[in-house]
Amino acid sequence: MKTLIAAYSGVLRGERRAEAARSENKNKGSALSREGSGRWGTGSSILSALQDIFSVTWLNRSKVEKHLQVISVLQWVLSFLVLGVACSVILMYTFCTDCWLIAALYFTWLAFDWNTPKKGGRRSQWVRNWAVWRYFRDYFPIQLVKTHNLLTTRNYIFGYHPHGIMGLGAFCNFSTEATEVSKKFPGIRPYLATLAGNFRMPVLREYLMSGGICPVNRDTIDYLLSKNGSGNAIVIVVGGAAESLSSMPGKNAVTLRNRKGFVKLALRHGADLVPTYSFGENEVYKQVIFEEGSWGRWVQKKFQKYIGFAPCIFHGRGLFSSDTWGLVPYSKPITTVVGEPITVPKLEHPTQKDIDLYHTMYMEALVKLFDNHKTKFGLPETEVLEVN
């Protein structure tokens, strides 16, 4: 009996020791679990903190990018509006200071270099590839769409439509490499033609020439199409100042019916005509439209007749806020579509019938280009290009 009791007691003691061991192991496991949980919790906190840092950094970088885009656009707008006049005033003032020699040397250089713009100017690939133009492009954004290849053995006249207020799409696509025009049209040298008066402005003329911009006059175009080899593409904003007066958001209209000079030049040199339309060019600024017969329109037409440009009362957004008015254009997409070239024969003395024929072909090609692409860029199928 004693033996049985002793054995039973031993079993009980063994069970108690086993239970105690299990309890101890459980407590250790709980401690390890809490310790591990703490370690993993700390890791999660660090990971979360890093994600927050990267998120803030990305947001800050995004804001910096946006500010750089606004500044890049504003510098071009101010250059377009006031750089020429400002530099002229500064140089004239410099003549009255101890630095008069600088102004004298520049004007001496200007006298020797006066005719350079008429021969295509001095384009600089370095200037055309400035990073500022990529920020300029991304602000809207602006893109260039190629529909057909261009032969390097031919010369071309691109008709650019519409003018808009400043022709921002024309500048970005053809006077910079931001949209890779040279890669899309290898072997083609684009020359954006603008008012000849801009090349009488000191410093501004150098800035324009560096981008491949030239005067829009007969002497310059004759030189580029006859004495500058092949592969030249003269980009002419056909509607000019008259077209800018009707520029407003939501309107697709071009001034073209009575603009035939560019067709005559194409025939005289056998340069192919290339219709080009920029969707969104009219969306980036709002302007006051004066009715025909009003005093405002009278003033605009007088400026256009005697000076070559028509002053517009327009506005975009403010520098620091899109909710205020200012000179910064609205951030709206601009897509420039380059159409199929129209083969033009070389006729030294084209008749009016020849000019009318190719002018009609050009108008039809432009309307077709517009109709084929309008729905791709947010316009309804019912939208019609107004040709004035």
Curated annotation (Swiss-Prot):
Membership in a protein family: Belongs to the diacylglycerol acyltransferase family.
Alphabetic keyword roster: Acyltransferase, Cytoplasm, Endoplasmic reticulum, Glycerol metabolism, Lipid biosynthesis, Lipid droplet, Lipid metabolism, Membrane, Transferase, Transmembrane, Transmembrane helix
Gene behind the chain: Dgat2
Transmembrane segments: 70-88, 93-112
BP GO terms, sorted: cellular response to oleic acid; cholesterol homeostasis; diacylglycerol biosynthetic process; diacylglycerol metabolic process; fat pad development; fatty acid homeostasis; glycerol metabolic process; intracellular triglyceride homeostasis
Gene Ontology molecular function, alphabetical: 2-acylglycerol O-acyltransferase activity; diacylglycerol O-acyltransferase activity; protein homodimerization activity; retinol O-fatty-acyltransferase activity
EC number(s) from the headed UniProt entry: 2.3.1.20, 2.3.1.76
Enzymatic reactions: an acyl-CoA + a 1,2-diacyl-sn-glycerol = a triacyl-sn-glycerol + CoA; all-trans-retinol + an acyl-CoA = an all-trans-retinyl ester + CoA; 2-(9Z-octadecenoyl)-glycerol + (9Z)-octadecenoyl-CoA = 1,2-di-(9Z-octadecenoyl)-sn-glycerol + CoA; 1,2-di-(9Z-octadecenoyl)-sn-glycerol + (9Z)-octadecenoyl-CoA = 1,2,3-tri-(9Z-octadecenoyl)-glycerol + CoA
Name assigned to this protein: Diacylglycerol O-acyltransferase 2
GO terms for cellular component: cytosol; endoplasmic reticulum; endoplasmic reticulum membrane; lipid droplet; membrane; mitochondrion; perinuclear endoplasmic reticulum membrane; perinuclear region of cytoplasm
Cytoplasmic side: 1-69, 113-388
Activity regulation annotation text: Inhibited by niacin.
